[in-house]
Structures are given as C-alpha cells and as structure tokens.
Design a protein with these regions (language model features):
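Bacterial N-terminal signal peptides that target proteins for export
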Residues: 1-7
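Bacterial N-terminal signal peptides
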Residues: 8-16
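Serine-hydrolase catalytic machinery in alpha/beta-hydrolase-like enzymes
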Residues: 59, 66, 71, 80-174
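Short beta-to-alpha linker loops that shape the active-site pocket of alpha/beta-hydrolase fold enzymes
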Residues: 117-121, 208, 304
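The feature captures the conserved acid-bearing segment of alpha/beta-hydrolase catalytic domains
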Residues: 200-284
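C-terminal catalytic histidine-bearing segment of alpha/beta-hydrolase fold enzymes
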Residues: 276-321
C-alpha cells in the first residue's frame, strides 16, 4: 500500500514538473519568435523634418534580394519642396560619412541628402558597384554576358527616389547626385547607361578611372563591347554632368587605384589626368556626332587631393545651380 502511494505521488510530481517545464519552454519559444519577428522587420522611422538617421530600403523586381541601408539628413522646414541629393560613397562604402559631408550644407541651403550604402555582401567587388552589374563580369564583356537593365545596380536609384518622394510627399520630379572616387565611377556610368533616369544633375568627383566614350577601346575603359548604343550616348551627353577634380589628386600609387596596360596607356597614371582625359575625349566624341554636349569640367579644386569632405564643399555650388 505504501509503495503504491509513493509511486502515485512520484508520478504526480513528475507531471507537475513536466507541465511547468513545458509552460516555461512555451514562454521562451514565444519570446524568441517575437524577437525574431522584430529583428526581421525593417526598422524604419518616418522621414521627418530636422532628422538625421538611417533606414533600410528593399528594392523590388530582379534585385529584391538586396538590402540597402540609406543614411539621410533632412533640414527643418517643408520637406515637400526640398530638393533631393544622393551622395554616393567610394570603395570604403562609408555611406554615413558621405551623408555627414552634406549635413551643414543641407541645413543652410534647404535640401535633403540621402547616402545609400552598397554593402559588400549584397554588392561584392567592383562588378556590382562601380560597374553596376551591367555584365556578369565587367572585365570580360560580351553580348552573351550582358545583364538585363532590371539587374543593373543603377535600377535601384529611381526606385529609391520614388520611395523617398512617397515618404516625404515630395513635389520633386528629379534629383541631383554627387559621387566621389568609386561613387563617381558609379555615377558617370549611370549617366551613360541610364540617361532616361530622373537624375537632373550629376557631379562626379575624383573617379579613379572611367568608361570613356571612345571607340576602339574595350569596356570597361571604352565603348568596344560596351553594348552602349549611339542613341544612349547622345542622350547621356544631353544630361548635366560635372567632371570635378582635385588638383592634388595626382598620386599614381594611391590605394585601390586601378593600373593595367590598357587604362594606364589610355587614361594616364593618376586620377587628375584621367579625369581630364575623360572630359576632353567625351567632348570630341560629341563634336564628332554633332550633338548637344552638356558636360562641364569645373575648375580644378585648389589645394585638395583625394578628400571627399573637401570635394563635397566645392561641389555644393554645382548642385545648387
């Protein structure tokens, strides 16, 4: 009798412990599920006047698997009538710094600045950022490896602009853009390959090397195998593009500056001479085609080398024109 009572009590006690443990586990699992949901939701704060922050943008379409942190600043005032500036980072992918370059100027001149970060996970190497995924391998282009335009990294920019317009109820129908170093590479190719975009003014500062509108030189350095039509090129020449160079950006051994027999013989050994070559050759191409040429080479920035903050300060006047 005693043994039966003891066995019953032991079973009852185990049932209580089991129920308690299951209940505790349910709570833990529920908590983990809630945390996972919270972590997977895009943490986005509405774009309000007078704010500095970051949000995550997910493009639609062929690049919907990509994720872009967008660092931004808005001045105080009516956002609906403020111009929109995109600031494109270089190879360091430090988009926060490229936003910060513009904060004071944005406040003083009443425009919004957005600096998208093309992270190295979703946009690895120069193929996905500097060369915008135009080809599967930008250094070995062919008609067979040409990606469709909806897979080009360029295709994200107008989408992002439309998203910002929606979030701010903006009345703007176009945007301006500034890029430095790798960002200037991305931006001048954006003008070449997507002249139909909503971009109004592009300021390209201190690009390391260029896709030059030059026949007989293979892409990514020239037009050969570029799959860039004359009609696109003519439209690109009609856009407003500033070639913006620091007079001291002359170090041929600068970090990440591309060197090979093609680009060195074609464009020169440093960023300054390469920028000059890009502009002069582009101008000659437009003259050869007898078409409108709205590209402008600005005065070279005195006392400044490869410095994005100083170049941004000088670029302001061209953004405001």
């Amino acid at each position: 009798m005693f043994l039966r009572q003891f066995t019953f009590a032991l079973i009852f006690f185990q049932l209580i412990i089991s129920c308690s443990s299951e209940s505790k586990n349910d709570v833990i699992e529920s908590s983990l599920e809630q945390n996972n949901v919270a972590e997977n939701v895009t943490q986005f704060v509405s774009i309000n006047p007078g704010t500095t922050g970051v949000f995550t943008f997910k493009p639609t379409g062929a690049l919907s698997d990509k994720s872009i942190n967008v660092y931004y600043h808005t001045p105080q005032g009516d956002l609906t009538n403020f111009p929109i500036l995109f600031s494109f980072h270089g190879g360091s992918r430090n988009a926060d710094d490229y936003r910060n370059d513009w904060i004071e100027m944005a406040n003083d001149n009443s425009f919004m600045v957005f600096a998208p970060e093309f992270n190295s996970l979703d946009f690895p190497s120069g193929d996905m950022y500097n060369l915008a995924n135009i080809f599967e391998d930008g250094d070995n282009p062919s008609i067979d490896t040409l990606n469709s335009p909806d897979r080009w990294t360029f295709s994200i920019i107008d989408q992002l602009f439309d998203f910002i317009k929606s979030e701010t109820s903006s009345n703007e129908t176009s945007y301006n853009a500034w890029g430095h170093s790798g960002g200037a590479q991305f931006l001048h190719r954006f003008v070449l390959y997507m002249p139909e975009s909503k971009l109004k003014t592009a300021v390209c500062s201190n690009a390391g090397w260029y896709t030059v509108p030059e026949s007989g030189v293979v892409f990514p350095y020239g037009l050969l195998e570029s799959q860039l039509s004359n009609s696109k090129l003519i439209s690109a020449f009609s856009k407003t593009l500033y070639v913006h160079l620091g007079e001291l950006d002359t170090n041929p051994n600068s970090s990440s500056l591309r060197h090979n027999i093609i680009v060195d013989e074609q464009q020169g050994l440093n960023r300054l001479v390469r920028g000059r070559y890009f502009f002069e050759t582009s101008k000659k191409k437009a003259e050869l085609l007898n078409v409108n040429f709205n590209w402008i080479k600005t005065p070279e920035v005195s006392g400044v080398g490869h410095d994005h903050s100083e170049m941004a300060k000088d670029a302001l006047k061209y953004i405001l024109e």
